[in-house]
Amino acid sequence: MTAAILIFVTCILPGQVVLQAQDPDSRPSESKWPTHGWAKAKPSSVGLDEKALAAFDADLASGKYSLVDSFAVIRCGNSVFEKAYSHDYGTIYAKEAKMRGPLNAHLTGPYNYFDPAWHPYYHGTDLHSMQSVSKTVSSAILGIAITRDDFKAGLDTPLLTYFDVAKVKNGDDRKRRITLRHVLTMTTGLDWNEEIAYDDPKNDASLMEATDDWVQYVIDRPMAHEPGRVFNYSSGVSELLAYIFQKETGQDIEKYGEKYLFTPLGIKHYWKRTPMGVVDTEGGLFLNTTDLAKIGYLYLHDGIWDRKQIVSQDWVRQSLTPFTDAEEGFKYGFKWWLLPRTDRPGYIWMARGFGGQRLMVFPEENLVAVFTGWEILKDETPDRDLVNRLLPAVRTQTCAAAP
């Protein structure tokens, strides 16, 4: 994921990536920053193949790529394609909505994933469940707090600093060695099974959401590995971010994000909370499609928005560094998925969520793509299949019109 605004260069040390700073003159003019809405342009005017996008749109509408709710493409600061696809989820999941199970431990409310009042859209609005894209946005808010020196602890601070150790089960020396860095990179070593389907009663994420105290459920898990050695995807570990943020800063992560991220970028949102009132940083955020694109655009511009440094370039660089091998051929940074490119060195940056939520950033093409969906009982479309439909639509490496 050369005429980019932001270029992902080669690794110069194991795990370290250098980002080439963008030329300030190449950034959008103030009038084009999409705080209050994206400027519109035809795909061909920014070097995209309109027929290729139209064919992809037709396949999305046909259901070839599962239950997709929306698709948007941003290139060179312009919205060149936005489309919503309608599905009657009340009918599609009517049977499941009436049966108690791992995805609807409560027959109504925010943690029944078949309740059409809550999923995929929040109470009839255009705010769509982001699921695990929430993790990536939470990482951005943490980065802002570090940038502003409101979060003072270093990333090598032990996780148990924020807990009464006497009340933590399964304590051993390995658990004492878990740090905030391990939380960000999914390498805590905690025993956690989220590889099986979410409607499987043995899935730890579903088990956690059926409890009242999610944070306690997570921190009480036994250890399976030495911290820092094994990537193990864990929604529970990501839920700890909200708790840690409150303990370290004395502030609520949603309210902080409202002030320093959502408002400056012009993003409207809703964020679910756990039964204990903790912000659901593992999967509870709701955004609309084009507002989600703003998160990718912020990172595409080194954390700068409308000529203001919202999150430091250093945090952006670290977030997009491939610290560990992950699943499905991905690398993993600070809550960002990094898909190795097959056509050149570098990565496509992604935020990924259950049901088909995808934020994709192609830095070398100056392109951001967003998908939302609600395919929650079947396998989602592989990310490379979507990438392989998007990249052929790019006709020019610059923002020049397609020939």
Predicted regions, residues:
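Bacterial N-terminal signal peptides
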Residues: 2-16
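Active-site SXXK
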Residues: 49, 54, 77, 83, ...
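A short, well-structured edge-of-sheet supersecondary motif
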Residues: 61-121, 366-370
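Short, charged, amphipathic alpha-helices and their helix-cap/turn boundaries
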Residues: 83, 93-118, 156-160, 199-226, ...
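Active-site helix/loop module of the DD-peptidase/beta-lactamase fold
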Residues: 118-120, 124, 129, 147-190, ...
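Active-site Gly/Thr loop motif
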Residues: 268-269, 316-368
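Structured C-terminal helix/loop/strand segments within mature extracytoplasmic catalytic/sensor domains
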Residues: 351-403
